[in-house]
Each structure stands twice: as structure tokens, then as C-alpha cells.
A protein has these predicted regions:
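Catalytic cores of RNA-modifying enzymes
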Residues: 19-21
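Helical "lid/coupling" subdomains associated with nucleotide-phosphate turnover
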Residues: 1-15, 30-200
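Acidic, divalent-metal-coordinating active-site segment for phosphoryl/phosphodiester hydrolysis
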Residues: 24-30
């Protein structure tokens, strides 16, 4: 499991489901400790899905979105089957910039006072925004909160992937973690450096 979310939420945070989407792949990990019980990656990144399954113009109607969703579900199917079923809800955490952008756009609510930059995005909020966002030309999306120029073209594709993996794993809401892979790499380096300097 990416170490950054585990450090951010604390080692007693329980079972974490960590979702990270990049341009080319979607990575999902689940576990209760630093090492994940399951950690998988599939070729369903925001950029890849946009290029392969959405109109070149960047604008998509309901039929386009449903066709893209069907393709995404096929890609996600092996991943979903690998995750154990449980009656206990998982603490779902999103770590990527795409997820943070979507959460800001969707109006994610703040929770747990005292924790910096903590926000929650529900699947209903995400699904409410996706068709509206898809109907807007990419060059006009930067006027919306949370949509940065480098993600304006692929944010719909990323949103579809996040929506589909949340539905498949029965995740109703996702907490946005301000730390991502880069911070996790730094933490691992600091741990290794500290052990080396201290001789253990």
C-alpha cells in the first residue's frame, strides 16, 4: 500500500482502500497495515480512457458516456474479482490529483475538524457532475473550480473510471488524501535513511 495515506490517516486507521489514478493506469490497494492485502493496477488511466473510449473533441453525450463505461467495466472486471468481499465498510481514500480536482468540482464536504485539507466526495456528487462536465468543451472547463489546464481534456475519463470502481467495490464516498505517491516515496526514503544513520 502507498505509505503516504497510511501515514496521513495513522496506523490505527483500520482497513484502507486506496485509489490512485494516473494518465495511463488505475491503481487500487487494500489492507490494514503498511503492506497491502491486495494491490493491483489496470490500464484504465484518465488519459488512456479518454483517448480510447471518448470522442476526440472531448465533448461527450449520454450515449458516449455509457459506451465508455462499458469498456471501463470490462477492464476493471479482473481487478474487482480479486478484492475480497466483506460486510465491514472500507475507509476509501483517493490520492491522485485527478481525484482531488473532481472532489473540488463536485463540492466535496469537509469533515473531521482538526485534520488539514480533509474532504469527502460522495458517488452521488460525482455522478451528478459527470454528464454536465462532459457536455462542456475542454477549453472551457478551466473556468470551473478544481479543473486545471493540464487535466481539462481527460478529467471526464478519469471521473468515469473513479465512478465505476467505486460502484464495483460498493464505495459510497471517498476521502481525499492530500498526500500521494511522491510523498510516500519521500517517507520511505526517510525511513531507510534513518535506519541507515542509526544502524538498524
Amino acid at each position: 500500500m502507498d505509505e503516504a495515506p497510511r501515514r496521513w490517516y495513522g496506523w490505527d486507521a483500520g482497513r484502507l482502500l486506496v485509489i490512485d489514478i494516473g494518465g495511463g493506469s488505475l491503481e487500487v490497494a487494500m489492507g490494514s497495515d503498511e503492506d497491502p492485502t491486495v494491490a493491483l493496477s489496470v490500464p484504465a488511466g484518465a488519459g488512456r480512457v479518454t483517448r480510447e473510449f471518448l470522442p476526440e473533441s472531448g465533448v461527450a453525450d449520454d450515449d458516449d458516456l455509457e459506451a465508455a463505461r462499458k469498456n471501463i467495466r470490462k477492464i476493471l472486471e479482473p481487478m474487482v474479482k480479486s478484492f475480497p468481499k466483506s460486510k465491514h465498510p472500507m475507509h476509501a481514500v483517493g490520492t491522485s490529483k485527478t481525484i482531488r480536482s473532481l472532489a473540488r468540482l463536485a463540492g466535496a464536504v469537509m469533515r473531521q475538524p482538526g485534520r488539514v485539507d480533509t474532504s469527502i466526495m460522495t458517488i452521488d456528487q460525482l455522478e451528478d457532475w459527470l454528464p454536465r462536465l462532459a457536455a462542456i468543451a475542454p477549453d472551457q472547463r478551466t473556468a470551473l473550480p478544481g479543473v486545471t489546464p493540464e487535466r481539462t481534456y481527460q478529467i471526464v475519463g478519469g471521473g468515469l473510471v473513479i465512478d465505476e470502481i467505486m460502484k464495483a467495490l460498493d464505495v459510497k464516498e471517498i476521502e481525499i488524501c492530500p498526500w500521494a505517491l511522491r510523498e510516500g516515496a519521500i517517507l520511505r526514503w526517510l525511513d531507510q535513511f534513518g535506519r541507515t544513520r542509526l544502524g538498524f
